[in-house]
């Protein structure tokens, strides 16, 4: 059955959702109209019932009729009886109104309000996440542009300022400079830093001490009095003093307080309670760990993704608030630098500029690389969220239609249970109620308002020098095959080989075929995709190891093939080729359904069979002639896919009811892979993809024999 999850996708994600929610809100308006209908009928029943009750009160001289009735006058008795029946009829109408309100109007109105809230919640959640994703995608595009600009600037600088020999010498100088900086940093770790609480600390020991305080001592947020502002990463004086006594060889509390005071003086701590620069061992005195403490210790700030690295101590301490700490450290580092400059290698101005540009490029590349894969993970999570909410909205819409059906039935029952004279009208209304078909309405919504099939847009990290070398999914087929040094992507061929390996262990043919046709949760597919995406594989064994250790179901492994093909920038059969094939299949349509019929042909059908065979011959000839224009990786990948299923179909035919099972699987796998080989159009439900894949399976030998023959000629 058609599903919301398959037909409300669009390239920007938003336009498909806009169409869907427009129809869902239209459904809410339908519910409001039903509420108006029920309320109007209730008001009519109330008004009509009261009018029937008021007939007796509006008549004159009823007292005389009462006297005549006491005297046994038959006419008066008839009048009294008619009035009583009218009053009884009024009671029935008021009862109907009461039942409509309590049994239909109130519960249905309450349900409609909740239904609208569910739609609003999903709309807000999805649009917020999709819009945030689109903003982040623009940010990644900006990073990509900056990265490529830096690459071009670097290459231009190399071209204009260096020849090949000078560039080689510059690279050697870079290695010498890096080694020199590492040696200086290593030597600096063991130089004297400061005397704290009577203990001499070198740089290394001071870093380790701060790392202990910043990572092992639990931090809290401190809310400043009178204003609604909180400071993060704080401890009170008592906590710091106790931690120092527990973890360091300090004599007593006084020495621990002195240690805390020195941390305050050096600018690692800041007093939070007001103005002052005194450290006190008390729970009432709150202190915040400053950013410079995290920078000095190379510890990531809470909430940041990576530690602060790569800056010299001078640049780090230039931003310190503690002026005394500045003077101490600047003087010591200045002396260290003076000593280091004596042994520093000579670097020209052009080389220095080159190294600076290379550092800037490396930083830009790293940031672009990280954000690219972070965006791809975000894209996967957004798709999973969309799948979940589309399924939820499909259930909500189905529930809405069923709720209208039930409310209509309750409404008709309320009328029919009371007044038999309305039976004919009620029967007609029941007929109308019976004509309500939620499934057909849901199908009509999908067919008329669908925006596109599921086509994930992978976020690709475009490295300037090695495009496609850092991920496997979303890279165009020719690039992937060139990097794999194969004509078929290594992931595709390896998964098919792995499936061939596990087929014998599966209990029966039904399980083997259902692997490729069962629905798989998108999050599980993305989980395995993530394991296979970043690593560059050299042989099938590496992929086999991941597939074996993942302990995922075979159907999940099979789904990765589909997601790989869907994420290709260009489908296996590109759009220009598919347009030609659409015309071909329009002129020579296949009769796929005849493959499922096992009846023998009668003499009167012989002429039709001959016509069909002629159509098939022309269509297949046109198919392999058109496909011959594809590149070698595209043809080889199509061949690998169809070969795998062709062999599986041959195995199925050898089992019990083999031909029937094989024919059913051929149809179902053609439907499953239709969107994987060709990009569908909204109007045709990708019937062309189904027909092409079906022909590739049923005429495989002829088609690929001709394709290989034509390629060998070329």
UniProtKB/Swiss-Prot annotation:
A single Pfam family, by name?
RhoGAP
Q: Which UniProt keywords apply?
A: Coiled coil, GTPase activation
Domain called DEP: residue spans: 218-298
GO annotations under biological process? Answer: cytoskeleton organization; small GTPase-mediated signal transduction
Q: Which InterPro entries match?
A: AH/BAR_dom_sf, DEP_dom, F_BAR, FCH_dom, Rho_GTPase_activation_prot, RhoGAP_dom
Can you provide one Gene Ontology molecular function annotated for this UniProt record? Answer: GTPase activator activity
Q: Which GO terms describe its cellular component?
A: cell division site; cellular bud neck; cellular bud tip; cytoplasm; division septum
Q: Which residues belong to any copy of the F-BAR domain?
A: 2-441
Does Transport count among this protein's keywords? no
Concerning CDD domains, the annotation shows: DEP_fRgd2, RhoGAP_fRGD2
Lineage: superkingdom: Eukaryota
List residue numbers at the site (Arginine finger).
Answer: 517
Q: Rho-GAP domain spans which residues?
A: 475-704
Q: How does it assemble?
A: Interacts with CDC42 and RHO5.
Misc remark: Present with 1750 molecules/cell in log phase SD medium.
Q: What does this protein do?
A: Acts in signal transduction. Activates CDC42 and RHO5.
Name of the protein in question: Rho-GTPase-activating protein RGD2
The beginning of the lineage is: Eukaryota, Fungi, Dikarya, Ascomycota, Saccharomycotina
């Amino acid at each position: 059955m058609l599903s919301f999850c398959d037909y409300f996708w669009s390239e920007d994600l938003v336009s498909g959702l806009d169409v869907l929610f427009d129809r869902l809100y239209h459904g809410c308006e339908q519910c409001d109209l039903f509420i108006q209908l029920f309320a109007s009928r209730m008001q009519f029943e109330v008004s009509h019932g009261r009018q029937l009750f008021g007939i007796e009160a509006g008549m004159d001289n009823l007292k005389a009729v009462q006297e005549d009735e006491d005297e046994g006058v038959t006419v008066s008795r008839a009048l009294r009886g008619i009035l009583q029946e009218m009053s009884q009829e009024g009671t029935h109408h008021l009862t109907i109104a009461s039942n409509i309100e309590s049994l239909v109007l109130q519960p249905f109105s309450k349900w409609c309000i909740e239904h609208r809230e569910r739609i609003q919640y999903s709309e807000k959640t999805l649009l917020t996440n999709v819009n945030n994703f689109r903003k982040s995608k623009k940010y990644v595009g900006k990073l990509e542009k900056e990265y490529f600009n830096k690459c071009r600037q670097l290459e231009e600088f190399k071209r204009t300022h260096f020849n090949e020999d000078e560039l080689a010498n510059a690279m050697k100088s870079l290695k010498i400079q890096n080694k020199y900086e590492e040696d200086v940093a290593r030597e600096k770790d063991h130089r004297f830093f400061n005397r704290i609480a009577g203990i001499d600390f070198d740089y290394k020991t001071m870093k380790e001490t701060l790392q202990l305080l910043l990572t092992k001592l639990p931090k809290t947020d401190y809310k400043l009095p009178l204003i609604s502002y909180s400071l993060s990463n704080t401890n009170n004086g008592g906590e710091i003093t106790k931690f120092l006594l527990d973890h360091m060889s300090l004599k007593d509390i006084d020495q621990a307080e002195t240690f805390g005071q020195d941390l305050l003086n050096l600018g690692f701590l800041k007093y939070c309670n007001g103005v002052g620069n005194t450290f006190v061992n008390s729970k009432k005195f709150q202190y915040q760990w400053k950013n410079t403490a995290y920078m000095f210790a190379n510890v990531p700030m809470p909430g940041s993704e990576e530690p602060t690295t790569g800056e010299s101590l001078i640049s780090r301490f230039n931003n310190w608030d503690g002026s005394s700490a500045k003077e101490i450290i600047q003087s010591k580092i200045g002396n260290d630098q003076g000593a280091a400059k004596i042994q520093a290698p000579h670097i020209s101005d052009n080389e220095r500029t080159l190294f600076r540009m290379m550092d800037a490029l490396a930083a830009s590349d790293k940031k672009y690389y990280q954000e690219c894969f972070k965006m791809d993970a975000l894209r996967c999570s957004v798709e999973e969220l969309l799948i979940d909410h589309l399924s939820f909205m499909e259930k909500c819409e189905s529930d809405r239609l069923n709720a209208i059906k039930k409310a209509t039935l309750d409404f008709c029952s309320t009328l029919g249970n009371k007044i038999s004279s309305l039976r004919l009208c009620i029967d007609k209304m029941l007929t109308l109620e019976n004509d309500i078909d939620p499934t057909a309405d849901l199908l009509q919504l999908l067919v008329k308002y669908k925006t596109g099939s599921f086509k994930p847009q992978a976020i690709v990290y475009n490295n300037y020098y090695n495009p496609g070398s850092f991920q496997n999914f979303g890279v165009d087929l020719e690039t992937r095959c060139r990097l794999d040094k194969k004509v078929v992507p290594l992931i595709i061929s390896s998964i098919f080989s792995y499936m061939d390996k596990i087929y014998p262990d599966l209990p029966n043919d039904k399980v083997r075929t259902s692997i490729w046709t069962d629905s798989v949760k998108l999050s599980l597919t993305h989980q395995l995709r993530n394991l296979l995406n970043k690593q560059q594989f050299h042989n099938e064994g590496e992929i086999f190891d991941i597939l074996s250790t993942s302990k995922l179901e075979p159907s999940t492994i099979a789904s990765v093939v589909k997601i790989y093909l869907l994420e290709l920038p260009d489908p296996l059969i590109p759009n220009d080729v598919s347009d030609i094939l659409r015309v071909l299949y329009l002129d020579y349509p296949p009769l796929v359904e005849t493959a499922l019929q096992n009846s023998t042909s009668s003499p009167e059908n012989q002429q039709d069979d001959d016509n069909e065979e002629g159509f098939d011959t022309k269509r297949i000839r046109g198919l392999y002639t058109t496909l011959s224009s594809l590149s070698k990786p595209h043809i080889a990948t199509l061949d690998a896919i169809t070969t795998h299923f062709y062999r599986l179909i041959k195995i199925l035919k050898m089992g019990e009811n083999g031909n029937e099972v094989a024919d059913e699987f051929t149809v179902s796998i053609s439907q499953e892979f239709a969107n994987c080989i060709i990009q569908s159009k909204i109007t045709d439900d990708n019937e062309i993809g189904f027909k092409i894949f079906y022909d590739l399976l049923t005429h495989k030998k002829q088609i690929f024999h001709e394709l290989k023959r034509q390629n060998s000629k070329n």
